[in-house]
Amino acid sequence: MPTDSPDARRTLGLAATTGVGVGAIVGGGILALAGVSFVTTGPSTILAFALNGIIALMTVASFAELGSRFPESGGTYTFARKALTVEAAFAVGWVVWFASVVAAVLYALGFAVFLVPVLQQAFALLGGEAPTWIGGRFALLVYALAAVMFYAWSLMRSPTGGGQWTTIGKLVVFGLLLLGGFLVLVSDLPSLPELVGRFSPFFEDGASGLAQAMGYTFIALQGFGLIVAVGGNVKDPGRNIPRAMALSVGTALAIYIPLLFLIVAVGTGGQSVVALAEENPEILVANAARNFLGAPGYWLVVLAGLLSMLSALQANVLAASSFAATMAADRTLPLRIEGLSPDGRTPAVAIKLTAGMIAFVLVAVPDVAAAGAVSSLIFLGVFALVHGIAYLVRKRAFQPSPYQSPFFPMVPWVGGGLCLALALYQAAAVPSAGVLAALWLAAGAVLFVTHLAPRARVVDARSEGFDPQLIRLRGRSPLILVPVANPENAGVLVKMAEAIAPKGVSRTQLLSVVRPPAKWEDGKLPTELVDAQGILGGALSAAIAVDLRPEALITLSDDPWAEITRIAQRSRPDAILLGIGELHQSIAAGPLERLIDRVSTDIVILRAPTDWDPDQAARILVPSRGGRAQSPIRARVLGSLTREARREVTFLGVLRESMDSSAVRASERELKALARDEARGSGTAVVLQRDDLVAEVVQRSRECDLMILGLRRSGRGRSVFGGPMLDIAMATSCPLLMISQRG
């Protein structure tokens, strides 16, 4: 949930953070799935939950390591964005957002189902008979929608939505249920053989039945992932996120295992637990509680169900809203979804959108069970991915995480493999779940490619420039080629290279091209090579001064520009940084034009005094004719420049005086969007109406420390050097960066 003051958002302590996980995990899963599991595998359901608990704790270890390293909202989406590509991050965020929405739908309907017997009992206490419609589909939808709207409203007022009281209430109810059950067991303690007999046969269908039960019931423990979804709200996240996740799963297991034991030991009413479960698996827990505590036991389960469904609903609405708001901040969802409440504490627009999606699925999707299977499948697949990301990040990261999972790399390998196996089982058991997940992902791919990709890639490029560790975490080591011809320019070029290719992440290759001497003398270096060594020696000295460790290369060629092209085509650098003294038409339309035409890489051209330093660029001017052809490289450069110091970045649009007001407003909106995407927090947009574009930009350039001009490429690798941009470059004297996005 992005805000302008991230520290102010960290309002959740250990107890509140644990409450998010406990609220999402405890109650709903066991009440809905215990009966199905007992039918499938008998008393070994206890073992199935215990084994799932081990898998969950291994997954918690990977989640906790990533959550403490990246204490931001967004959870699994954020992890994918840090370690993979923006496209992969969108895919993860898109499906997990949907999975959380569907989970919220299931819990809203679960609340409605548990509310019906309460209403029926209320009518009975009032001396009347409950009408049949109170349990009909329309009434269930009304109850469910009311719960969704209530939590959406409460979350817009408070980051936690007041759900902690519901969580505390259900823990108290489950505690009373367990206490009552064990008192009954102790008061009428059977002999050991009799007690053991109630658990026989332990396996109803052998190992296959146990595996099936594990596949069915793992979702009863998966809510711990919602903790990292709100990681940006957690105080002292390096300490509290790992503890809260472990406490959440531990609390769930401390309730589930004893409750399952009591169901078999004292809750079957004299028949086998499998027979009792087969009668009505959905309400097995309630029937078992009635058997060992009478009517109070039944109503305790109903109350536990109501509170469990409400707390899980609240946790999923909170997490889904957090996913949506974080994705909007990265432009992997439309920017307007990032909108905050008036006090800046909650993502109001994302909450409204999420509530609307939940309501739509409630009303429009008749087969909610299939949708629930999709949710389970997505979570399992994403959990397997998180294990893989945890492994990659541990291997690639420069600094250790505040929390590191034990037994590395066994935990991510084994945990990821088990989660993947459960996901494949789920896909095979419910084929429609895989189909629905694929359809949702395909719809997202169309949305991303047609609408979201340009802005998302720009923001991602800016993020890589601002935080170079992203490049390292993604397993890349970009190469920057820096041809050096003039020893006086070597220092400023190295400083610029260090700004856009920081040490420890990128590689820099210094290149000096020497014309072959007319005559070689044995035992003596030609003057040309001696001069080249001096040039590279000066560049290397400047590089060492800024702790950069570049490669150095000297080549021989009669045509330096053609040689630069050849080296670029061979080494395939991510960018070429060129330094020029004076820019004139013969260079721009000649060798420079041919170089840009023949290489498929980003081009950065620097014109600056020899004593200039990028740190001096406090005020940056970006003339723009609109469009996003140069946005990714410009965003990356601006991100690099704003990494160490805050800059004032002005995007300048100059329109003809004859342009009508509606076109001016449209241009202003577009330029403001560019400024937000490329220089968030430091960019402003200025739109003027002047007939002399060049004169206006030249006048403004006198007040800036650096100007950035984009050189458009049209067609395959072609640059357009003519027109106003070249005129501006030739008419100004301020430090200048000209950039050209790869073709």
Can you name each region flagged by the protein language model?
Residues 1-33, 39-41, 57-61, 73, ...:
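Membrane-interface "cap" regions at the ends of multi-pass membrane proteins
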Residues 136-139, 337-346, 383-430:
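C-terminal membrane-solvent junction of multi-pass transporters and transport-like membrane proteins
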Residues 2-8, 45-46, 50, 125-139, ...:
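Helix-loop-helix junctions that connect adjacent transmembrane segments
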Residues 136-190, 245-249, 372-385, 411-414, ...:
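Membrane-interface loop-to-helix entry segments
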Residues 113-120, 171-199, 261-269, 383-398, ...:
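Hydrophobic alpha-helical segments and their helix-loop junctions in multi-pass secondary transporters
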Residues 78-79, 85, 117-122, 200, ...:
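TM-loop-TM module centered on a large, flexible mid-protein loop between adjacent transmembrane helices
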Residues 182-186, 447-492, 498-499, 509, ...:
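Intrinsically disordered or low-complexity boundary/linker segments at protein termini
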